[in-house]
């Protein structure tokens, strides 16, 4: 029995949810998000709550139950509050600069890295070592943050690179003579 799946998703005021043709559409103050629904799970919009239950008692349906409830909750949270990830850049000469729909990164390569910002994502650089990625789609925000981080992952000796705010970098000691 999924303990996460049993809890109903509450819909705050100003948010509407509709189910049509196997697609859940959630509209809120920040925008609109959709989710393709699985056949193994039944979804019910009941007033200001969305109930997620397995359609039949198979192992596969129970496996998707909690995940589908969380995906629905992510849609509701996205259209009301949005999601933000913050990246911190550490290293001499490492910088970031948001220029319109591009993020320009200087990461110690012989060239600058130009990262095009996808649709639905907003990138800000409050200072040249901090990158704030925000949007309404949790998956897309995390994906963009991971793609930016991939250009220069933090290394364990000096900690240089791009890391998430609050991420712990396991440090190693250098060679001893």
Swiss-Prot record:
Keywords: Ribonucleoprotein, Ribosomal protein, RNA-binding, rRNA-binding
Entry-linked SUPFAM superfamilies: Ribosomal protein L6
Family (UniProt): Belongs to the universal ribosomal protein uL6 family.
Subunit structure: Part of the 50S ribosomal subunit.
HAMAP family with a match to the protein in the record: Ribosomal_uL6_B (MF_01365_B)
One Pfam assignment: Ribosomal_L6
Protein name: Large ribosomal subunit protein uL6
UniProt GO molecular function: rRNA binding; structural constituent of ribosome
Gene source species: Novosphingobium aromaticivorans (strain ATCC 700278 / DSM 12444 / CCUG 56034 / CIP 105152 / NBRC 16084 / F199)
PROSITE patterns named among the record's database cross-references: RIBOSOMAL_L6_1
GO BP term (any one): cytoplasmic translation
Domain of life: Bacteria
Role according to the record: This protein binds to the 23S rRNA, and is important in its secondary structure. It is located near the subunit interface in the base of the L7/L12 stalk, and near the tRNA binding site of the peptidyltransferase center.
GO CC term, one of those recorded: cytosolic large ribosomal subunit
């Amino acid at each position: 029995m999924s303990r996460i799946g049993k809890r109903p998703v509450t819909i705050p005021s100003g948010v509407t949810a509709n189910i049509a043709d196997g697609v859940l559409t959630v509209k809120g103050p920040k925008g609109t998000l959709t989710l393709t629904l699985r056949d193994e799970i039944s979804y019910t919009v009941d007033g200001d709550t969305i109930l997620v239950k397995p359609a039949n008692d198979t192992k596969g349906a129970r496996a998707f139950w909690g995940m589908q409830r969380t995906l629905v909750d992510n849609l509701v949270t996205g259209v009301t509050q949005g999601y933000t990830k913050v990246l911190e850049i550490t290293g001499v000469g490492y910088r970031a600069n948001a220029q319109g729909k591009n993020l320009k990164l200087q990461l110690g390569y012989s060239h600058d890295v130009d990262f095009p910002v996808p649709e639905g994502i907003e990138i800000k650089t409050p200072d040249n070592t901090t990158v704030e990625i925000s949007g309404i789609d949790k998956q897309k925000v995390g994906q963009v943050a991971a793609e930016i981080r991939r250009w220069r992952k933090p290394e364990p000796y000096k900690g240089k690179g791009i890391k998430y705010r609050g991420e712990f970098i396991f440090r190693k000691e250098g060679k001893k003579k």
